Amino acid sequence: MPTNNQLVRCGRKSKIRASKSPALNGNPFAKGVCVLVKTITPRKPNSALRKMARVRFRNGTCVNAYIPGEGHNLQEHSTVLVRGGRVPDLPGVRYHIVRGVYDTQGVKNRKQGRSRYGTKRPK
């Protein structure tokens, strides 16, 4: 327990919280190029083939990013926009690819929740 004099001299140091998406360097988004596009299986008890891409940013760092939605058109050398946000059942995947930006197309035939998947309003 510090004395009042010690608190006046030094004050309390607040804890520094570790970032959940360190590769973005505090930015909301980052532009990158796909190095690898593949499917991986989730942890127990879930079962699926989840789509993910390995993305290299301009500064050279590589991250694993999840491709949300049904179907995608990404391949190697595609330019993508990456945001933070983990996928709970995929270990090591802490980023999401933003649909409908750069080379990533929006999800086809999407009627609800379109803004998350880069889909235009149907006529």
UniProtKB/Swiss-Prot annotation:
MF GO annotations: rRNA binding; structural constituent of ribosome; tRNA binding
Subunit and partners: Part of the 30S ribosomal subunit. Contacts proteins S8 and S17. May interact with IF1 in the 30S initiation complex.
Sites of 3-methylthioaspartic acid modification: D89
Name by which UniProt lists this protein: Small ribosomal subunit protein uS12
Origin organism lineage: Bacteria, Pseudomonadati, Pseudomonadota, Alphaproteobacteria, Rickettsiales
HAMAP family: Ribosomal_uS12_B
Biological process per Gene Ontology, one example term: translation
Family that this chain belongs to: Belongs to the universal ribosomal protein uS12 family.
Gene3D superfamilies, A to Z: Nucleic acid-binding proteins (2.40.50.140)
Species this chain originates from: Orientia tsutsugamushi (strain Boryong)
Source species, domain of life: Bacteria
UniProt key word Cell division: no
A GO-annotated cellular component: small ribosomal subunit
Alphabetically ordered keywords of this record: Methylation, Ribonucleoprotein, Ribosomal protein, RNA-binding, rRNA-binding, tRNA-binding
Xref: Pfam families: Ribosom_S12_S23
Stored PROSITE patterns: RIBOSOMAL_S12
Biological role: With S4 and S5 plays an important role in translational accuracy.
